[in-house]
Amino acid sequence: MITQASIQIIDNANMVHELDTLFKPKSIAIIGASSKELSIGNVVIKNLIHYNYTGKIYPINLKESEIRGIKAYPTIFDVPEDIDLAHVIIPSKFVPQIIEDCGKKGIKSVIINSAGFSEMGEEGIALQEAFLAKAKEYGVRIFGPNCQGIINANPEYNAYCDFTFTFPKPGSISIVALSGGVGAFIMQSLFDLDIGMRMYASNGNACDISISEVLKYYGEDEGTKAIILYTEGFRNPREFIEAAKLVAKKKPILAMKSGRTEEGAQAAASHTGSLAGVDIATELIFEKTGILSFNNEEDMCQAAMAFSTQPIPKGNRVGIITNTGGPAVIATDELVSVGLQLPPLSQKAINILKETQLPEATIGNPIDVVATGGGIHFRSALDVLMNEENIDSIFINFVTAPFTDTDEVARNIVEVNRLKRKPIICNFMTNLSIDRFQTTAKILKDGGVPCYSFPTTAAKALGALYKFQKVQTRNIGEPKKFTDIDSSLSLPKGNGTFLPSSDVFKILSAYGILVADWRIAKNTDEAILYANEIGFPVVIKAEASSLVHKSDLGGVAINIKNAGEVKLAVDRMKLKFKNEELKFLVQKFLPGGKELIVGVTAQKELEPLIMFGLGGIYVEVLKDVIFKLSPVTELEAEEMLSSIKASKLLDGVRGQSGVNKKSIIEIIQRISQLVNDFPQIKEMDLNPIMAFEDKTIVVDARIKI
Amino acid sequence: MITQASIQIIDNANMVHELDTLFKPKSIAIIGASSKELSIGNVVIKNLIHYNYTGKIYPINLKESEIRGIKAYPTIFDVPEDIDLAHVIIPSKFVPQIIEDCGKKGIKSVIINSAGFSEMGEEGIALQEAFLAKAKEYGVRIFGPNCQGIINANPEYNAYCDFTFTFPKPGSISIVALSGGVGAFIMQSLFDLDIGMRMYASNGNACDISISEVLKYYGEDEGTKAIILYTEGFRNPREFIEAAKLVAKKKPILAMKSGRTEEGAQAAASHTGSLAGVDIATELIFEKTGILSFNNEEDMCQAAMAFSTQPIPKGNRVGIITNTGGPAVIATDELVSVGLQLPPLSQKAINILKETQLPEATIGNPIDVVATGGGIHFRSALDVLMNEENIDSIFINFVTAPFTDTDEVARNIVEVNRLKRKPIICNFMTNLSIDRFQTTAKILKDGGVPCYSFPTTAAKALGALYKFQKVQTRNIGEPKKFTDIDSSLSLPKGNGTFLPSSDVFKILSAYGILVADWRIAKNTDEAILYANEIGFPVVIKAEASSLVHKSDLGGVAINIKNAGEVKLAVDRMKLKFKNEELKFLVQKFLPGGKELIVGVTAQKELEPLIMFGLGGIYVEVLKDVIFKLSPVTELEAEEMLSSIKASKLLDGVRGQSGVNKKSIIEIIQRISQLVNDFPQIKEMDLNPIMAFEDKTIVVDARIKI
């Protein structure tokens, strides 16, 4: 019976995607094909042949009649059939004309390997714009320029449209990388680890087809099980967020962004040209969209090995089986560090193990089957852990002790691994130059057991599987839309200035945020009047558009207790600032709360970042702050409170009372709504906000528009 | 001319060391030799033969006349010649007798592979003590029991006294590991990286010959260039510190201590038995003695590769040469993260590079010679960096672009590397399954260039070389001996109690530490009298031996401004505590300083730890504290101040004044002297000490003896 679901799958499989001519070309023209060995125009053809490309190759060369044994044509117009994809490997100045030709010929996708465009200054930018205009006119999609190309390792295509030198076997990991150099060594690393690859894309200047578009394409590709992504920044971060949100929960995206130090970012700028948009926000984008972020490319590749064969664990509870002590200690350290737990075994499990293990074995978690333990001992431990309800994943340390039948151990691991019920990760310690152990390794490898050479590396890989489980189950929810906002509020256009305090407080009040009671006084008498209205003690702050860091300049007087002190403070400020427009902000003084900060930083091409942390002088001293990309949901705001280092302070310590966390969480969300409503806000600091047991009140704030 | 120095070296080389019979045995008896394949008593003989052991092998077996083709003897007494070393592979209960036999035969070193001793409870402990007594009586040194053994890869010996399966080629790295499993995979990892090994030792229960003793032996071995050490704790940390101090500045010691999480420590306890002594102090021991600490065993092995061939850089300034963009960005990030700097190139260097590099090259630091750059381009960049005064080391990213003569590039790198003037680390990105690139790799390998597969891994290795340079040049100096101490001070024996405040303050004063002026009052009148003497405002604290956490219990009244308030406070405390022996500590109230903490924790078998950090409630909330192992020198005390996260606070921020750091540094040193003078001090907290611009004063303190 054909069900609705199966129809959909069939439809999906037959659906033609715009990028199919790029990733699944039935025919490829190489414009700039060359008979010169080691030239890119020759290497690309050589690679297609070497990789057994299943489609047709059309070398385009004005003079040669054949290249590498394949008939060549003077121009694409001389090719008698349709062409899906063209490689362009000619000097940059000829590219606009060639793109027009491709359009006329009906070629849908073009990989421009040639350099000499936006990465080379004005002249190059003009050329890039010229060929892009032609591409738009004719509906040609451009991959590159200044790029490597793509690879599709699916045997149906074997499309090696690239000049690199690694020939991966087919698999389920797809790679997209901004840098060809990094993409290539990631591909090589998978190859060295004997992990198959699905697709590869390295798009250089990325003037048309973006990383985001490739990411979505991989997301829709049924053969792609996990994705590796490398970038140094995003030209269009919003587009990326959209794409990542679609894909990241369905398939693990393992990503690395370099240029995380100032020096690294400089090095990045020097080779990719200016990448507009985000820098520090990239990690926040990864977090928000559920991308697994790595800052070590080797860890990323090693984790990919686990994703390529293992199921995702249901939780963070791991059982360890080991036949050697020290490596289990190292593994335990790392497993715990990445958030996994080692629950004790059930009495039932202990009873079974006591009957089945050697007398020297240690029954517990880890289970030490000892070096003399054989296949049956590993098997009973594996079976026990597979049946333990409290265990979500299995970590194995397997050293090939010379006095055991290691093949038998491997066969038992493989049999249990085939069930695919819980992920199994194996730290396999052996000497592969010994034939006997090569056999053991092959049994594990063929049985789909991911094998690592170090306990820490293996533990990190299991940590990555668990992290993806958290990504899949984490639901940040939708940002709350507060409806008690004063909708009459309007803000002037951004002009790079700070708003007067009175405006700032009005804006906060309009958004339902508590502000310490305040008035603006023009003179001493008004200041005394207002102080009485507000109730002592008060704070007095000098107000003039030129004053920003008031407290550093002596423009703030705190804890004013009576009219006499008001007069003194006002007189002193008058004397100090001698400013015609000087006014005086009289505000309720609120000592004894915990000083916190909520801040906002606008981002080019991206939503503003919201910051929360310890306020007052501790902002600078401790930098104990957390950023999130807005809009911030309630769950995210809660996470901000619990992730600062001083989060204990909010709960109250040593007799001190805690704060009203709910009110802080609400302020963060209201600020998030405010800055999303008014994109002209460039910068905002509520510092400090005073958090009390019952409520939280803003006592100082500034807004730059 | 034979100088004094050269005589010493000759003497040293000929000197006979007690452990020579263990590491350089001329003859080995295998007591428990077996003809059974895969048994340890057979594998050890097989390994000795396979590794071409240069000495004589004497299998000892009551029944067999030969084992693996070698004449066997019923007992060691039947062996006609002297024996240097014996392997003991017999049931534990026979071991005491065999050790006595060994003693009688004049065997100086014994490796006990057999298990069944201290790791197996009381009976085992008794057996271990029994054979140890015999060993002492006859002057036999014991390695093990429950251990693997040793390996000496020096071709003069080829002594493979171990049952493992990795056969390293000779080299300059020596390994000592508590866990045989970890030792074995470290050895295997060096083998996989094609790094030679010098010596190997894994001593299991370590009942006699300790890791410390082996470490000293490696330190004196001229062929050992660097040492890898793995442990899960120390039985005798003082002995280890002595050994490490002797060796760590001469030769890099790369070390890893596992069991750093609670769960990991538990796992360690379950397989090594209880290791008395330190746990959290291990990192501090490593720091104090100059050991390079790793928490990732792969990083440690990769770093060893750099140490095995490269000189130590003179400083932290690195020049990068790359022929691909992205990997240079990744490398830059990591290099900067581990403390290296990328200085700009001199004008002279830039001029040379402009003349010698391709037009597409990026001239700067990194120098991007681009993928089409060949041998001459790499060479000119290398020569320039070798001659730059501001560059201490060279990092190379070398991808084997198919369109360049990669052998020529490799040859140029090797020629410059042979100079050994500055360390060269190479991230070599290639496909070793391609013959052409295998040749390139061999050129680099034979030329002693350490090659890595990932930029981050390579950068970490260079970071380790730099770290050793810091170790070699760091001189913490000797602990200062303050002579203005009141030498009449005495302390009772430790009894697990807290000293009364009056005693605590007297002790601090005796050690020249400023304490806020104080008196002990018996009643209200005395309290008022003393408050007047001290000067208001004061603090009043309830004093009785039963009161420890006074402030939590309402036993502290601060900011008392006059006699009336004194009376009120005293009356309230009387009512609250209803304690016959209740007294009242009247002390100067000192608001406005920065609250800091200095603390002490005693360690079993080791000097106490000194702690410094943010005081008051921030101790618990932020845990912004630094520990050092006492005695703490002036430099170390300075490091403590500069390494807390809030160190900026001490310098003063946003108009706030800084503190008198010198006075804090002195307090730390005086406390260090105090606890070294009085080992009965179990615990001490000066919390808070109030730091002002001019001085630092202790306002509260407790001491447990």
Where do the model's predicted regions map?
Chain A
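Catalytic-core regions of core metabolic enzymes
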Residues: 2-705
